[in-house]
UniProtKB/Swiss-Prot annotation:
Keywords: Aminoacyl-tRNA synthetase, ATP-binding, Cytoplasm, Ligase, Magnesium, Metal-binding, Nucleotide-binding, Protein biosynthesis
An individual GO BP term: phenylalanyl-tRNA aminoacylation
CC cofactor: Mg(2+)
Record note on quaternary structure: Tetramer of two alpha and two beta subunits.
Gene3D superfamilies: Bira Bifunctional Protein, Domain 2, Winged helix-like DNA-binding domain superfamily/Winged helix DNA-binding domain
Gene assigned in the entry: pheS
Organism from which the protein derives: Sulfurisphaera tokodaii (strain DSM 16993 / JCM 10545 / NBRC 100140 / 7) (Sulfolobus tokodaii)
Example of a GO MF term: phenylalanine-tRNA ligase activity
Binding-site positions, Mg(2+): E390
GO cellular component terms, semicolon-separated: cytoplasm
Annotated cofactor note: Binds 2 magnesium ions per tetramer.
InterPro entries: aa-tRNA-synth_II, aa-tRNA-synth_II/BPL/LPL, Phe-tRNA-synth_IIc_asu, Phe_tRNA_ligase_alpha_bac/arc, Phenylalanyl-tRNA_Synthase, Tscrpt_reg_TrmB_N, WH-like_DNA-bd_sf, WH_DNA-bd_sf
Protein name (database record): Phenylalanine--tRNA ligase alpha subunit
Length: 469
């Protein structure tokens, strides 16, 4: 079956037998690019032979067009001299920017000579006839003249592809292709005059590279949606934090190893905290519980937060009225060697529930709801120790192909923390590393792929967090 343009080209070649692609394009009013592609199709169908040639073409530059219109500089110089000697400054004033070019080419062609500051003509008249003819018809020009014009940047040389197309097989019967089969064509029988296009029902639809979210960003948004659906409100805080919220309010002693330089990023300068009552309560609780002299200056040091629990600590410090259910998703920063499983900045999800009579059993049920929502149906809990919760558990989820994998840490907030913020209700908290969770759920072996920028890779990535899996 032949398309409309294929038929046009074959009918034209039936008369001409042979023609260039450029000629076909002009005569049939078909874009030259379409002629190239249609020629390839007709060649594959055995109707034509295609011979490709490369030819050199010359084009006038803007300067070349100016010379054709205004004349060559050396012509102007000879005309100004009019067979008489003249001073250089006088000619320079009249010729302007063309003066240097005119002197150079006039000397090279033997039209003038220079004596001190005087230009002496050697000819009375001069016309650059050969150069002008070469600009008009460069293909027939003398090689030396042509090279001169190229050197003077009056012409540019281009290599063009020319297709010569020759008919080798006449089509037995040419029927135009029918794109739309209408009821009228069926009723009248007109459809028989056309070739019906065959359809490949197994062919894939065309691919359109439309914009899409980065797959890890989409993963984070799905987690946010899940937490909101479970009745949690999202809270935020800055990356730069004071140690008070990152450690002290969470009953982490000032000599704890996690506060050393190799486990957190320090920032020069000090922060501020105006809640003197809260500062004094934290001081008393630390000195009573850990038996050391608590230093407020240490707690005011700036750092890049090492855990998003610093955000929920700020919620606690605001002394909220129960019931409250909040979560935060954000970046945290810890010194480490970057490899397939470690980064120095990564994402965490922290949650906090404050309710009257909230029990450890309620906490485990909440965690099970969250992980079921992510798509992890089998959950186990293992007793653990964390500085700011008691009792505490580690959460393990069963991942296909990997078995039981640690997913999160959780527990009821220690009474020392609740005492510091004057909250009498029970509170449960948990935190999980989102980047490693994403690696497990998305089947990645390198954590760095979560931040990939390769367009093809991102285009083909999919995100599936399905509670029904």
């Amino acid at each position: 079956m032949l398309s409309e343009n294929e038929i046009k080209i074959l009918e034209y070649l039936s008369k001409k037998r042979e023609a260039s692609a450029e000629d076909i394009s002009k005569q049939l009013n078909i874009p030259i690019e379409s002629v190239f592609s249609i020629s390839q199709l007709l060649k594959e169908k055995g109707y034509i032979e295609v011979e490709e040639k490369k030819v050199i073409k010359y084009e006038l530059t803007d300067e070349g067009k100016r010379r054709l219109k205004e004349g060559f500089p050396e012509e102007k110089l000879v005309k100004l001299l009019d067979g008489k000697e003249k001073k250089i400054h006088e000619l320079k004033d009249k010729l302007g920017r063309d003066f240097e070019i005119s002197i150079g080419w006039a000397k090279r062609k033997g039209l003038v000579k220079i004596d001190g500051d005087t230009v002496i003509p050697l000819v009375k008249d001069y016309e650059a006839k050969e150069e002008k003819e070469a600009l008009i018809n460069p293909e027939k020009a003398n090689k030396d003249i042509l090279q001169q014009l190229l050197n003077r940047k009056l012409l540019i040389k281009k290599e063009e592809k020319i297709l010569n197309i020759r008919l080798i097989r006449e089509p037995l019967e040419i029927k135009p292709a029918l794109i739309f089969l209408t009821p009228e064509l069926l009723a009248s029988g007109e459809w028989k005059k056309y070739a019906l296009r065959e359809y490949n029902v197994e062919a894939y639809p065309p691919f359109y590279p439309i914009g899409k979210k980065h797959f890890f960003k989409e993963f984070l948004e799905r987690l946010r949606d899940l937490m909101r659906d479970l009745g949690f409100k999202e809270v935020y805080s800055d990356y730069v934090e004071i140690e008070f919220y990152n450690f002290d309010l969470l009953f982490q002693a000032q000599d704890h190893p996690a506060r050393e330089i190799h486990d957190s990023f320090a920032i020069s300068g000090k922060g501020k905290l105006t809640d003197e009552k809260l500062i004094q309560r934290v001081k008393q609780i630390h000195e009573r519980g850990w038996k050391y002299n608590w230093d407020v200056n240490i707690s005011m040091r700036l750092m890049l937060r090492s855990q998003t629990t610093a955000t929920t600590a700020r919620v606690l410090a605001s002394r909220p009225k129960p019931p409250i259910r909040v979560f935060t998703i954000g970046k945290v920063f810890r010194p480490d060697s970057i490899d397939a499983t470690h980064l120095i900045e990564f994402h965490q999800l922290d949650g906090l529930v404050i309710e009257d009579n909230f029990t450890f059993r309620d906490l485990l049920g909440t965690l099970k709801e969250i992980f079921n929502g992510i798509g992890i149906k089998e959950i186990r809990f293992k007793p653990a120790y964390f500085p700011f919760t008691e009792p505490s558990v580690e959460v393990y989820g069963k991942i296909e192909g990997l078995g039981w994998v640690e997913m999160a840490g959780a527990g009821l907030l220690r009474p020392e923390i609740l005492e510091a913020v004057e909250i009498s209700s029970s509170a449960g908290a948990w935190g999980l590393g989102i980047d490693r969770l994403a690696m497990l759920l998305l089947g990645l072996k390198d954590i760095r792929l979560l931040y990939a920028t390769d367009i093809e890779y991102l285009r083909n990535r999919k995100v599936e967090i399905n509670a029904d899996n």
